[in-house]
Amino acid sequence: MTVVTITPGAMSFADWRAIYEGASAALTVGAWDAIDASAAAVARIVAKGDPVYGINTGFGKLASVRIASDDLATLQRNIVLSHAAGTGAPSPTPVVRLMMALKLASFGVGASGVRRETAAMLEAMLARGLIPVVPSQGSVGASGDLAPLAHMAAAMIGVGKIDVGGAIMPAAEALAQAELTPLELGPKEGLALLNGTQFSTANALAGLFRAETLFRSALITGALSTEAAKGSDAPFDPRIHALRGHIGQREVGGALRTLMAGSAIRASHAIDDPRVQDPYCLRCQPQVMGAVLDLLRQAGATLGVEANGVSDNPLIFADSDEALSGGNFHAEPVAFAADMIAIALCEIGSIAERRIAMLVDPALSGLPAFLTPRPGLNSGFMIPQVTAAALVSENKQRAYPASVDSIPTSANQEDHVSMAAHGARRLLDMADNASAVIGIELLAACQGIDFHAPLKSSDALEAAHRHLRSHVPTLDDDRHFHPDMEAATALIRSGSLVAAVPASLPGVG
């Protein structure tokens, strides 16, 4: 198993993606000294006896209740058990694994006050593939992702359930099989495990990873559709995009030029083409997809900062033995980033669906109706376009900003929340919808290109065409369409379409 070394504050987009895709994670050696110093500071604060939130007081609205020294361990266990109140379907294992690594990285900064044993338990569970079962619903994104992180923490103390290679078993049993002893929490540790934005951030990053793959796939299918409709590459001229100046627009224009370079199909209508301008879904790809790229990068920058920061409360400053209460648990930046990704996913699918609709309409594409050689007897791509329209409409509904919502909790002590978890959790479903739309476009565009034989497209797009045809044959007559759609969508989701094309395409990280 690949192991990513967690260097707190210096983790890259690629590092987090590797963990999401199955790598384990281990703290860099230097982080353990920071953890030890922070834990020692908590011990000195406890010995001093002054009331400090989360160490010797109650939580939330009960912060004014002082807790006796003999009850401090019980206090931390109680917060884990009482806050493990999530509901809904289990979160995807890759998301939970990433959440655990994000929490481990946060502890490694040395501002949470946890002991070495607590961080080591997270590290050991990651190394052994012990992934807590975490219900997906229950967080409002402040005070942190309390319920989801409580389910993670519960597994660490031997309560709840753990996924071990797809087998769900009681946490205590899974820990015993891995020769791990359930944690006994010390002062501040229960709160440190629960307080933070790691669940929302993990879900948002997962959505961003999928969005990047989708974005690159859609550049390829967009170029294929342009070829199928005998569209012009003139709108991708770099002089146009230089005058406007947006970086994403310039990069997308360049990518489309690269993808279409050397096309015999394009050369066949480069002179005396009666069409002066293409529909927006072809002509404005650099403007639309460039804006998508810029938005994804902005979201990525925000999540990169969040993933490398500390969203605990209170924060422990070991050099002065201070515990400062603040609001780093408020996930507003993550909520905004998730909303950006949702909008981007929506637009990737939206413009692709318009290209599909254009291709099946002979008045717009010049191709046979619904891309079938014998329309009437055959319906061809009639209903796949309807499916794409349905999926795009569903994503439009889901793209409503989560961050504009708020609801008071904890007896109005926590009176403004981010809804980051809600905003981030929807992203994988939206990515699934958009993947299916791009898969349908891949089928439709390659079908359209087949009508131009023996003319060939560019080397890059011919590689994409061959890759699809190695899985799905040309549609000569109507057949069961669902398997074709599933196969094409799998090429999009896996990233294999992008890998098959010999071109460097812009991305987030």
UniProtKB/Swiss-Prot annotation:
Classify the main location: cytoplasm
Enumerate the InterPro entries for this protein: Aromatic_Lyase, Fumarase/histidase_N, HutH, L-Aspartase-like, Phe/His_NH3-lyase_AS
User: PTM comment for this protein?
Assistant: Contains an active site 4-methylidene-imidazol-5-one (MIO), which is formed autocatalytically by cyclization and dehydration of residues Ala-Ser-Gly.
Pathway participation: Amino-acid degradation; L-histidine degradation into L-glutamate; N-formimidoyl-L-glutamate from L-histidine: step 1/3
Single GO MF descriptor: histidine ammonia-lyase activity
Coiled coil (UniProt feature):
none
Q: Show the catalytic activity.
A: L-histidine = trans-urocanate + NH4(+)
- Enzyme class (EC, first level): lyase
State where the protein is found: Cytoplasm
Please give the residue positions where the record annotates the modification 2,3-didehydroalanine (Ser).
143
- Return the EC number: 4.3.1.3
Kindly give the PROSITE patterns that the UniProt entry links to this protein.
PAL_HISTIDASE
User: A GO CC term?
Assistant: cytoplasm
Lineage, top-rank taxon, reads Bacteria
Q: Which GO biological process entries does UniProt record here?
A: L-histidine catabolic process to glutamate and formamide; L-histidine catabolic process to glutamate and formate
Alphabetically ordered keywords of this record: Cytoplasm, Histidine metabolism, Lyase
- Spell out the Pfam families in the cross-references: Lyase_aromatic
Q: Where is this cross-link: 5-imidazolinone (Ala-Gly)?
A: 142-144
* UniProt similarity note: Belongs to the PAL/histidase family.
Q: What is this protein called?
A: Histidine ammonia-lyase
